[in-house]
Amino acid sequence: MPLSFGGHPFFALFIIMEILDLHGVRHEDAEFKIHRFIYRASFPCKIITGHSAAMKDIVNSVIKEYDLKSHYENYVNNGCLVVTEHRNG
């Protein structure tokens, strides 16, 4: 049964994602943690990088190794990447 808002029906879709939070993780430890997370994760999943450009580079490097894709969670928060599987076609 759809929910209603102002008399208009709408449907809510919630996707539960696994999250890796890299706040407080040293750059030299991050790559191992990201590999371990990606290996075990189901997709889509989130990786919170914070605003560190170096941490974002590390995350993107690992994501490329697995031929995965990522995008920012939203335009306001560029400290969180959503990682998705690469689909050919």
Where are each of the predicted segments found?
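Long, charged, low-complexity intrinsically disordered regions
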Residues: 2-89
